[in-house]
């Protein structure tokens, strides 16, 4: 899909667009079993779209068909007329809340010196500008292939005719060996401790897996699907060449925590999920290669070089040392701005440190990264809570700008009867207290340590947080741990890898069950969960089928402890509202790419990003917003506006 990415960037000043909603390629790649094709406007000689337009907004221009946007009224007549289904009508926001609908199609990158970007960037050279003579030749070649009974190269069958003109990338794809996974500790071994379960790649493994990358263009689809737009094919090429220092330096241009994201990112939903090889021999193991180069380089003493950075004299207060705050601080310090990071916890990382269990993320990595950030010039004020130990008024008075990356710490409730009873725990306090226990830190009254050894534990929920709770309880030595989820396994929001790991470690799963009430014993302590069985009904607004209770299907599952993992809401920050920062109906901070300066709030000196803005989401989306907000802060300090790509 390098052609799609190239097309979008060619129409956006060679920059990635800032939101998925703006990713509107004028060429579409279709992948289906036995078929791969790119579809776009054919610039027909007697174009039906031209004839259908009631306002003369589409016209022949030489050998191409062009849309005159100033005349387009968004009527969709061209969409109906196009026999190839390649016309779109897109809606773009205008001033004062207005929108404009206009036709959107391939324009052959009119005015672009190098010609169509899709042709230039296709790694397999499968796209070309064709005249009549070329089309006749291609038709002859197709007829010849049909006569020879050839199949597509990626189907790995041996054709009856030779393929002297097959592209190098197609041959490379056909010869690519299967994906290799990192070694993993045996389930019985890993259940006995909280150490990371995945072993790092050896240099040989890293080389073998890097060699599988097809290098799909300068800006590949894996780069686009990564919220940070990491230069993935480029640093994989450097790994192939054995240049780890250059690879890690390149990865740090877009990501200040590559050793973290390599471990905890859901690559299967992002970069690896988009990999061209995914459906053939398995996606390139991007996350493990990222982890390898970071671990190798940092262990050997590599550090970011900021020797050429000149201090600007500006200072920015950052509230929250989680992914958003750290990414913001990293970008600011690289531009000569002094970031001072305030956090209520004794270590940086936010939920990276205290929410993600140590068996997924070794906590020593955050301590090392704090030392690196400090060497770069970032100052940390830990065990310091805004609104308690320091006021927002002080920050606004003493700093040139403030960034809020406070995350989301308030657990969602299901509204079940007896959910406040003894033995019922919210997921996040349970995980935070456990991590503090592992790190040798004292528990707090708000987050008391809970040991589930010998207990029958039921975890309600189906996301990664639920899996973290399940696997933590198993490591405590719980007698039995069951995860109960209201939909089927295919609809679980959590990572398939995490579900697989939990099963290997002994977790039980109960699908299509909806909790009705929490049962109590004579002492008022939880002793079970009453469920109704469900079946999947009509889709909800998000397209997922709703679980519908089955009448008369009630049953009680015994439980000594119940952990509720339904997700998180933004927690209340009265000091934020007092400063004049507008919130939405769900308590999230109103800020985004459409702000005057990226991620500026209703209070001009305050910027925000991450989960406090978008709700609970991924580490990389929080980091991406932290970086966007840093750009907004830099522009605000310089009083200039960055184009809204």
Where are each of the predicted segments found?
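FAD-site-proximal beta/loop scaffold in flavoenzymes
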Residues: 420-454, 539-616
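Glycine-rich Rossmann-fold phosphate-binding loop(s) that bind the pyrophosphate
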Residues: 320-323, 462-463, 611
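FAD-binding core/adjacent interface of flavoenzyme oxidoreductases
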Residues: 235, 259-263, 269-319, 335, ...
């Amino acid at each position: 899909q390098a052609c799609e990415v190239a097309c979008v960037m060619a129409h956006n000043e060679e920059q990635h667009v800032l939101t998925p909603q703006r990713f509107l390629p004028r060429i579409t790649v279709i992948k289906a079993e036995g078929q791969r094709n790119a579809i776009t406007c054919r610039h027909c000689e007697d174009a039906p779209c031209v004839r259908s337009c009631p306002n003369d907004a589409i016209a022949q221009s030489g050998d191409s068909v062009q849309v005159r946007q100033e005349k387009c009224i968004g009527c969709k007549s061209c969409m109906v007329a196009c026999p190839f289904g390649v016309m779109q009508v897109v809606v773009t926001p205008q001033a004062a809340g207005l929108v404009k609908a206009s036709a959107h199609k391939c324009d052959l990158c009119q005015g672009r010196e190098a010609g169509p970007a899709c042709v230039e960037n296709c790694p397999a050279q499968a796209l070309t500008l064709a005249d009549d003579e070329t089309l006749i030749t291609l038709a002859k070649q197709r007829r010849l292939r049909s006569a020879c009974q050839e199949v597509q190269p990626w189907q790995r069958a041996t054709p009856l005719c030779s393929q002297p003109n097959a592209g190098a990338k197609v041959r490379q794809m056909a010869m690519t060996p299967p994906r290799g996974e990192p070694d993993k500790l045996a389930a019985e071994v890993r259940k006995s401790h909280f150490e990371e379960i995945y072993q790092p790649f050896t240099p040989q493994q890293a080389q073998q897996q890097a060699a599988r990358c097809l290098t799909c263009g300068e800006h590949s689809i894996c780069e686009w699907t990564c919220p940070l737009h990491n230069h993935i094919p480029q640093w994989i090429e450097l790994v192939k060449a054995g240049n780890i220092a250059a690879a890690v330096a390149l990865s740090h241009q877009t990501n200040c925590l590559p050793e973290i994201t390599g471990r905890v990112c859901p690559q299967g939903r992002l970069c690896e999920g988009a990999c061209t090889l995914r459906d053939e021999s398995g996606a390139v193991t991007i996350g493990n290669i990222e982890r390898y180069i970071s671990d190798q380089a940092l262990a050997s003493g590599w550090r970011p070089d900021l020797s050429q950075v000149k201090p600007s004299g500006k200072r920015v207060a950052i509230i929250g040392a989680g992914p958003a705050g750290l990414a913001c601080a990293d970008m600011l310090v690289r531009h000569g701005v002094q970031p001072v990071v305030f956090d209520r916890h004794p270590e940086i990382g936010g939920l990276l440190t205290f929410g993600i269990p140590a068996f997924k993320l070794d906590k020593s990595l955050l301590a090392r990264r704090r030392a690196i950030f400090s060497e770069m010039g970032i100052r940390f004020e830990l065990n310091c809570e805004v609104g308690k130990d320091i006021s927002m008024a002080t920050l606004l008075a003493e700093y040139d700008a403030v960034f809020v990356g406070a995350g989301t710490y308030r657990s969602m409730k299901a509204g079940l009867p007896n959910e406040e009873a003894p033995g019922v725990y919210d997921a996040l306090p349970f995980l935070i207290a456990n991590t503090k226990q592992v790190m040798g830190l004292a528990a707090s009254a708000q987050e008391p340590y809970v040991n589930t050894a010998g207990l029958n534990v039921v975890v309600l929920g189906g996301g990664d947080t639920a899996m973290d709770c399940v696997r933590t309880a198993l490591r405590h030595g719980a007698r039995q741990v069951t995860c109960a989820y209201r939909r089927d396994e295919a609809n679980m929001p959590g990572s398939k890898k995490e579900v697989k790991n939990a099963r290997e470690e002994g977790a039980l799963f109960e699908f299509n069950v909806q909790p009705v009430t929490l049962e109590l014993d004579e002492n008022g302590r939880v002793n079970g969960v009453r469920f109704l069985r469900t079946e999947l009904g009509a889709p909800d607004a998000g397209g997922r089928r709703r679980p519908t209770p089955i009448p008369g299907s009630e049953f009680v599952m015994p439980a000594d402890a119940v952990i509720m993992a339904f997700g998180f809401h933004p927690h209340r920050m009265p000091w934020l509202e007092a400063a004049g920062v507008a919130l939405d109906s769900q308590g999230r901070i109103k800020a985004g790419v459409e702000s005057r300066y990226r991620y500026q709030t209703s209070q001009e000196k305050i910027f925000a990003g991450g989960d406090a803005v978008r709700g609970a989401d991924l580490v990389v989306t929080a980091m991406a917003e932290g970086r966007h907000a840093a750009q907004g802060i830099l522009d605000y300090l310089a009083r200039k506006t960055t184009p809204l790509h």
